[in-house]
């Protein structure tokens, strides 16, 4: 800690821990905990087998650990672990942390030497979905739902409004909100009929999404209301003098605002709360209608990125005992992300897909994490993306969507 508070971002450690049945795992765990708490990189090396004596054995365990993540470990006593430490990320994490705010600065000896900078090939693994853990997905999904449910419960307590009102579209975002609201009702010991699920088909609604929305509401035991808004929107177009065949932003936003008005009015009518469905990815990108889906009484998806939402919905689809619910959840997970604000095709097919406009959400969330959460420059993020998505997206595609994201 003294070295870190003095400014050290990388600590080279000579370890004297002998080999045991648990020493490898114990050393990895300890370094992950320490480096995460103090935000530093550690290069650790233990004695090789040549140092083994009568009562102690060594096998040259070497590790490279970066801010809580083990990047490289020597295997079978090879005594070699190679990886890269991200100094920029470490400094950025320290600026965001309270650990160093009031930490005392201790006097230390300082030595200087010359370093030659050179760009090398990156060897460390870069996660494609940085917001979603590699393992323990069950714990991750349950924690996400619990956090959403407990936040909603507290808001309902403050307002004394115990009826969540949700616009259900048949997409992953509103589906996750339905699941979280059902969990909130279960925790409170309230009937799930307190949930008012409202589906509002209009010009861009497909049978697939409408049927999935109805199935989710019915299987979760919510009160279902099907309210077509097409005629109301057409009347609004007449009022403002907008041509129905002009599929501009007016055409799209009028539908989104009509849905929001219906939800807020129903919430007033049942003494409830309009629970929003927009997620963090959409908010960060501005992919929502101002005074439409951009507003609600309480938004429990605000801290969930699109990849997180999809991961939780997929997990529930694979673990629920309700086969009908599981089928609908899987189909929702498999449905292209869409606001359904433009008319469908002649054969009822979906024509408007969000990812055609804003880019693949797996890239959106990757950019969000490395630029906003980690403070990376566009050039750095592009280099990381080329490594993470090698073979999936070419250079020109990554540049195109990164420019779009930074615009």
Put a short name on every predicted segment.
Residues 2-81:
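CN hydrolase (nitrilase-like) catalytic-core segments centered on the catalytic cysteine
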Residues 39-40, 51-52, 66, 84, ...:
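ATP/NTP-dependent adenylation/nucleotidyl-transfer catalytic domains that generate, transfer
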Residues 1-8, 31-32, 150-156, 281-282:
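Structured alpha-helical segments in the cores of large, soluble enzyme domains
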């Amino acid at each position: 800690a003294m070295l870190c508070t003095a400014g050290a971002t990388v600590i080279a450690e000579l370890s004297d821990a002998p080999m045991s049945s648990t020493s490898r795992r114990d050393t990895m765990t300890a370094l992950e905990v320490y480096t995460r708490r103090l935000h530093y990189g550690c290069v650790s090396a233990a004695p090789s087998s040549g140092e083994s004596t009568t009562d102690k054995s060594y096998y040259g365990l070497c590790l490279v650990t970066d801010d809580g993540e083990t990047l490289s470990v020597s295997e079978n006593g090879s005594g070699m672990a190679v990886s890269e430490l991200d100094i920029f990320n470490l400094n950025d994490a320290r600026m965001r942390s309270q650990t160093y705010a009031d930490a005392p600065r201790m006097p230390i000896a300082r030595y200087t030497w010359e370093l030659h900078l050179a760009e090398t090939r990156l060897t460390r693994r870069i996660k494609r979905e940085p917001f979603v853990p590699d393992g323990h997905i069950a714990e991750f999904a349950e924690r996400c739902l619990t956090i959403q449910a407990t936040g909603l419960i507290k808001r309902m307590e403050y307002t004394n409004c115990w009826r969540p009102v949700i616009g259900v579209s048949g997409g992953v975002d509103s589906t996750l909100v339905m699941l979280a609201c059902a969990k909130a009702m279960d925790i409170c010991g309230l009937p799930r009929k307190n949930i008012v699920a409202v589906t509002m088909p209009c010009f861009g609604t497909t049978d697939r999404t409408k049927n999935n929305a109805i199935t989710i509401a019915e299987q979760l035991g919510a009160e279902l209301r099907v309210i077509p808004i097409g005629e109301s929107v057409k009347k609004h177009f007449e009022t403002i003098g907008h041509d129905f065949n002009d599929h501009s932003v007016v055409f799209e936003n009028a539908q989104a605002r009509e849905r929001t008005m219906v939800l807020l009015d129903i919430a007033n009518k049942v003494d409830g709360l309009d629970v929003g469905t927009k997620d963090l990815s959409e908010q960060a990108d501005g992919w929502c209608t101002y005074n439409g889906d951009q507003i609600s009484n309480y938004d429990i998806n605000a801290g969930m990125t699109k990849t997180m939402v999809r991961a939780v919905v997929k997990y529930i689809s694979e673990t629920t005992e309700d086969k009908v619910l599981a089928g609908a959840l899987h189909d929702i997970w498999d449905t292209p992300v869409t606001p359904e604000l433009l008319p469908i095709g002649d054969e009822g097919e979906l024509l408007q897909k969000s990812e055609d406009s804003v880019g693949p959400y797996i890239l959106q969330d990757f950019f969000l994490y490395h630029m906003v959460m980690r403070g990376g420059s566009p050039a750095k993020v592009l280099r990381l993306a080329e490594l993470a998505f090698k073979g999936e997206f070419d250079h020109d595609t990554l540049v195109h969507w990164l420019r779009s994201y930074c615009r």
